């Protein structure tokens, strides 16, 4: 019956989705243009192809994760019987045709994926060379701030692969993608697909015709139908903006008191020029490094910063790259040439491009040390490409500290702020301390401010800046102090701190130049006021798996550019010689990534987490139990049969599971796990833990029976394979269970670690043996295991390294949203159980998965399994950190 219900669900899901595509929301020009449901790499996988009528149907229909009234929602385990939950189909329904349609609430994006071994020009009609056509010949001439846009046209012939054409589209008359343009635009080229193999189609190309079908002014759905009906050989006639003529030059800037001194706009999802994701210079700040150098101009396109490309990055990523530079910055810049000859908003004289600096009235600092700005805003002449107000374009000044004079309109008037003279600053400590870092204190060179934490007391006051020398703290003279003495003075200064500071950029510059070499060698020391020791050990390199999420923007103590990562990421630690900071690169399937940065060491992570846990325990309510300890104790006391069989208790098993009792005594801090790369020749078992795991397991086996299997046939209600229970008349040995000859034999096998999990029910033993898992794995199927987290380690010991996925709920509310029948109390219990699972087995998980819908979670699980399938995988090593 269970298998029949599953088939019904799949058929019902296909029909329901085909008939109930959510309509696009009209009228919004601020859209999200990324495919909504699945990673492109996964969509091109054979796993995502359903079988229908004996033939492969390319792509699986997938809906948005939004709460559209037409969105399909999986049934949860406690939902009503299937006959009461099918949607009412009032219209006549044709046989379901599964296609991939990815929709979001504000825009529709069609993924047309595919992979072909070659792409060629149709012999019927050769692709002509690109034709340059001036838009004067069009009925409606597009303009960008008075400049006519020139287009070129190209015909591209693609051969459809097994899964489609290999690109994503957005737009249409019902939901324009760029401004009011009704065109159908290319939003993504899928790596390995037909379009990528051909190499001519580009992001932002506008499709005018598909074979003989005109799609220049049609709805999104009509364009999708035209692409679907185009056959195996597809001719696309596309329009693209003529590339801007520009010369590329390199500019070296040296930061001064006002940082780099320019503003930027643009980026992916925040285009400064419609259809262009580039980063543009929009303002040159008076007195900044860019103005003094004289070569950078408004309208220049930033191509690279040092070794980091700014092509196809978001605005935030570009800002982060520019902010995290040292004092010497190399820019690769594209400068416009003849395209601006008729542009009335061509490059202005930078000395006249903006009105004089707005007047800043700085009031006396209040109790919180903040400054009050009252600005008079004179009219600003339009920039070269500014069809939208600047506050909608994400324009941002790039300077040394975004909270001080670098932010537009917050420049300091020298009449009010005599930086070169010693000055008194009063700060009040907040949750982040004083909000700045210090360096120096060696050989009497002085103590300098090296970093201002955004949003901290120092930042909010606006009075302290990088390059300030700290002369005294609450009357304690620090002019000749060591780093340790200065840190102690700041720590012990109380809530209200009076600082005498003097801006000395030249002295600080010399000091920073000296420590630059140390940074290059990774001899970093913590620049927070809490520590300043500099320890150098022998250089050490290793690979680790991250067991926590790390966001560099949230770490105020970073000594240099940090490297963000997520749980499960593999990191190549290039240098682990320092006790506080390691230098690392993220490892991708293609090898080490180019991005390199600093990450906190294992010692630093664990020290900070212990300090946090002490605070949490101190603030806990009286009578509350340590969740980890209580959970472990509960598992030890309640030894009953369940879907998660607690491991059979015996002397050896107790020794093996000793970590459970140890964890109840001492909190386990997760930081990094040393790993090595290994080649495997089997399909890795899959263990999914957390809410909705049963639905995910069932769907994987139902959708991909050739890829996934279980230790027993799916029609059997039990997920365990071996038992000491006598065989019943209707049961078959080896099909329903492996019936053991005697209890003594099974107990012996358990003691010899031949079972990954075992339990007792009605005086009979049940369990899943290592051999049964290996049998499935060696036949090329991922063995789906419904076991507890303890089985992960036991499989590793047996050298069957599982893919262990933890479904981590976002919140109690999200659980109730995914399962409408859950009460708040039930959702809370489910959430608490999930958190305890993470606490107890977090170090063994391959990946954490989160999503707003079951469909989203399911797709992420498939993606993780595909990425982790091998043949090369990372496994725990015995190296000590």
Curated annotation (Swiss-Prot):
This is Disks large homolog 2. It comes from the Eukaryota. It holds the Pfam family PDZ_assoc. SUPFAM superfamilies: P-loop containing nucleoside triphosphate hydrolases, PDZ domain-like, SH3-domain. Residues 683-866 form the Guanylate kinase-like domain. The keyword Lipoprotein applies. The lineage of its organism: Eukaryota, Metazoa, Chordata, Craniata, Vertebrata. One of its GO terms (cellular component) is neuromuscular junction. It is a lipid-anchor. Belongs to the MAGUK family. May play a role in synapse assembly and function. Residues 155-242, 250-337, 424-505 form the PDZ domain. GO terms for biological process: cell-cell adhesion; chemical synaptic transmission; establishment or maintenance of epithelial cell apical/basal polarity; nervous system development; protein localization to synapse; receptor clustering; receptor localization to synapse; regulation of postsynaptic membrane neurotransmitter receptor levels. Keywords: Cell membrane, Cell projection, Lipoprotein, Membrane, Repeat, SH3 domain, Synapse. GO terms for molecular function: ionotropic glutamate receptor binding; protein kinase binding. Residues 539-609 form the SH3 domain. It comes from Danio rerio (Zebrafish). PANTHER family: DISCS LARGE, DISKS LARGE HOMOLOG 2. Residues 16-41, 63-88, 709-729 are annotated as: Disordered. It is found in: Cell membrane; Postsynaptic density; Synapse; Membrane.
